[in-house]
Amino acid sequence: MIDRDKHQQLRIGLASPEQICAWSKRILPNGRIVGQVTKPYTLHYKTNEPEKDGSFCERIFGPIKSGVCACGNSRVIGNEKENSKFCEQCGVEFVDSRIRRYRMGYIELACPVVHVWYSKRLPSYIANLLAKPLKESEGPVYCDLFIARPIANKPTSLRSRGPFKYEIQSWRDIIPHYFSARGFGAFRHREIATGGDAIREQLAGLNLQILMDRSYMEWKRLGKQKSAGNGWGDRKIQRRKDFSVRRMKLAKHFLQTDIEPEWMVLCPLPVLPPELRPIVQLGGGELITSDPNELYRRVIYRNNTLTDLLARSRSTPGGLVICQKKLVQEAVDALLDNGIRGQPMRDSHDRPYKSFSDVIEGKEGRSRENLLGKRVDYSGRSVIVVGPSLPLHQCGLPREIAIELFQAFVIRGLIRRHFAPNLRAAKSIIRDKEPIVWEVLQGVMQGHPVSLNRAPTLHRLGIQAFQPILVEGRAIRLHPLVCGGFNADSDGDQMAVHVPLSLEAQAEARLLMFSHTNLLSPAIGDPISVPTQDMLLGLYILTVGNNQGIYGNRYHPYYSKYKIFSCKKPSFYSYDDALGAHWQKRIELDSPLWFRWGVGLRIITSVDREAPIEVQYESLGIFHEIYEHYRIGKNEVGEILSIYIRTTVGRIRFDREIEEAIQGFSRASEHPNKSLPAIII
């Protein structure tokens, strides 16, 4: 088993035949070697006990009951006084039955079998290494083509002929070139190969360093060629360059990982532990078996048949042996990836068997369903909605979710503050949802961040930390600017919330994962928290006016009914006065008004030196210069007394939000150790 304290990472790759045998072979104290599965049986039909040397054998995989052998004898596990650790009659070790979850077996194949993942899937690694088309590399795998053995790499006329099919006419054309048909059997065994033997010998004869150097030289030569002037020639050169790059990468990977190419051809076939492919007995005595058991059974049946044919090879026709090799290859293909070559193997109910590929890949496979998508404690899930009033670093957590996530902390708080004497009383208070519960919960959440995650997590910003606050409803609320990092929108997307428990996790969340510290894309450095279409539309509606300029809509029919608005617009001296009038519905969001501006503040217009439209004089010498978007009041000596700008309530509100945001960032930069204040962006 893998010790998580000793191993920090897990790498999946090819295993050598020696490694596969080392996983399974064991030497018993009496000197017998066990581990090889030779019989296609699983359980005895009368006793439901595992068959000896079958795919559920207790001698190979361990006892079904801890410390009990197949004979029924028992030993105390871990008792040093017991001399024998295995049964001398049946050969079963007295160990824990959990060993059947990870102890493996193996099947010694009568002929090498090519792993279908590396021959049939695109790109085909075997075809790339051998520099052959996919059909030509698959022909020898299923005994459809024969090739000459690479004996001392001599350029014989047979090798120069290329692959040929197993046909009577083909043999008749080849035999007269060499000798009579009397010694053709020995000649075929020595000079001609097919099946996994042929592919394995070709892969074993490769020099990866020379292959990589030649591919690099070819890529370099093709790169120097000028364009042919037609699309077909250029595409052909580009395909050849891509092929050279794939060969270089593949050869480099084999060299760096110390993996031999011939390991893509299986000689011993590993057998999964029986607990990973169980047989379940129903109430009526009926047995239900896993699909890999049936696929293993077919492999063992066909492999044993091939072994018998090879044992009496003198009396067995060569075509029968070749046909049986093809059946073994197809059985192993169905075990690894059923249906990859067309029609899958089916059971009696016409249902395709689930192979290893079906169990591993896909959304419901082992990786995504059981390893990556496992539910964990202190986590929840809900739909997300927009919370525009939230600061950038906060998220709204529903009360129902928050009380479940922080229940342990709330119980501790209730007991510490003497609101509950014990655990049962604290849970009763939480169940009744008394007001003190929400007070304690808010205190707990104030200093505890949470992590939000939206699947699929394609980059670092798929998980970010937030300061939670309690909200009503059942949906998680998020600031709209952080949705870009999650690639989320508010049309029904769901997000998971996790509570970091350890101090290290909380420190990481505060220092590295808070949303206000992840404003730039880690890939290209561009801003990722930018306004989207809905926010831009809202800003446009907030800042647009219903008319432009001082003369805009002067003769609109609406103002002809209300003369006071046609001649004089309301004036306000502060933000609060203007916003208060809007909340009292005296003016609309886009209604034009005069707003008092600071005398020392600059007025930015589209024209540098704008001439006044008109000048209005009063009796005391005070006059007003009226411009397109503002007016200036001056005394008789020309000193500025007042400035009013023409704006709307929406623009005043937008300006105030920007001002508060800038002040908030200024305070945060002056006190970097304090938490970020509530900023509305």
From Swiss-Prot:
<dbReference type="GO" id="GO:0005739">
    <property type="term" value="C:mitochondrion"/>
</dbReference>
<feature type="binding site">
    <location>
        <position position="491"/>
    </location>
    <ligand>
        <name>Mg(2+)</name>
    </ligand>
</feature>
<dbReference type="GO" id="GO:0003677">
    <property type="term" value="F:DNA binding"/>
</dbReference>
<dbReference type="GO" id="GO:0008270">
    <property type="term" value="F:zinc ion binding"/>
</dbReference>
<dbReference type="InterPro" id="IPR000722">
    <property type="entry name" value="RNA_pol_asu"/>
</dbReference>
<feature type="binding site">
    <location>
        <position position="87"/>
    </location>
    <ligand>
        <name>Zn(2+)</name>
    </ligand>
</feature>
<dbReference type="InterPro" id="IPR006592">
    <property type="entry name" value="RNA_pol_N"/>
</dbReference>
<keyword id="KW-0150">Chloroplast</keyword>
<dbReference type="InterPro" id="IPR042102">
    <property type="entry name" value="RNA_pol_Rpb1_3_sf"/>
</dbReference>
<keyword id="KW-0460">Magnesium</keyword>
<feature type="binding site">
    <location>
        <position position="71"/>
    </location>
    <ligand>
        <name>Zn(2+)</name>
    </ligand>
</feature>
<keyword id="KW-0934">Plastid</keyword>
<feature type="binding site">
    <location>
        <position position="493"/>
    </location>
    <ligand>
        <name>Mg(2+)</name>
    </ligand>
</feature>
<keyword id="KW-0240">DNA-directed RNA polymerase</keyword>
<dbReference type="InterPro" id="IPR045867">
    <property type="entry name" value="DNA-dir_RpoC_beta_prime"/>
</dbReference>
<protein>
    <recommendedName>
        <fullName>DNA-directed RNA polymerase subunit beta'</fullName>
        <ecNumber>2.7.7.6</ecNumber>
    </recommendedName>
</protein>
<keyword id="KW-0804">Transcription</keyword>
<dbReference type="GO" id="GO:0009507">
    <property type="term" value="C:chloroplast"/>
</dbReference>
<comment type="subunit">
    <text>In plastids the minimal PEP RNA polymerase catalytic core is composed of four subunits: alpha, beta, beta', and beta''. When a (nuclear-encoded) sigma factor is associated with the core the holoenzyme is formed, which can initiate transcription.</text>
</comment>
<comment type="function">
    <text>DNA-dependent RNA polymerase catalyzes the transcription of DNA into RNA using the four ribonucleoside triphosphates as substrates.</text>
</comment>
<dbReference type="InterPro" id="IPR034678">
    <property type="entry name" value="RNApol_RpoC1"/>
</dbReference>
<dbReference type="InterPro" id="IPR044893">
    <property type="entry name" value="RNA_pol_Rpb1_clamp_domain"/>
</dbReference>
<dbReference type="GO" id="GO:0000287">
    <property type="term" value="F:magnesium ion binding"/>
</dbReference>
<dbReference type="GO" id="GO:0000428">
    <property type="term" value="C:DNA-directed RNA polymerase complex"/>
</dbReference>
<keyword id="KW-0479">Metal-binding</keyword>
<keyword id="KW-0862">Zinc</keyword>
<dbReference type="GO" id="GO:0006351">
    <property type="term" value="P:DNA-templated transcription"/>
</dbReference>
<dbReference type="Pfam" id="PF00623">
    <property type="entry name" value="RNA_pol_Rpb1_2"/>
</dbReference>
<dbReference type="GO" id="GO:0003899">
    <property type="term" value="F:DNA-directed RNA polymerase activity"/>
</dbReference>
<comment type="similarity">
    <text>Belongs to the RNA polymerase beta' chain family. RpoC1 subfamily.</text>
</comment>
<feature type="binding site">
    <location>
        <position position="90"/>
    </location>
    <ligand>
        <name>Zn(2+)</name>
    </ligand>
</feature>
<keyword id="KW-0548">Nucleotidyltransferase</keyword>
<dbReference type="Pfam" id="PF04997">
    <property type="entry name" value="RNA_pol_Rpb1_1"/>
</dbReference>
<feature type="binding site">
    <location>
        <position position="69"/>
    </location>
    <ligand>
        <name>Zn(2+)</name>
    </ligand>
</feature>
<feature type="binding site">
    <location>
        <position position="489"/>
    </location>
    <ligand>
        <name>Mg(2+)</name>
    </ligand>
</feature>
<dbReference type="InterPro" id="IPR007080">
    <property type="entry name" value="RNA_pol_Rpb1_1"/>
</dbReference>
<keyword id="KW-0808">Transferase</keyword>
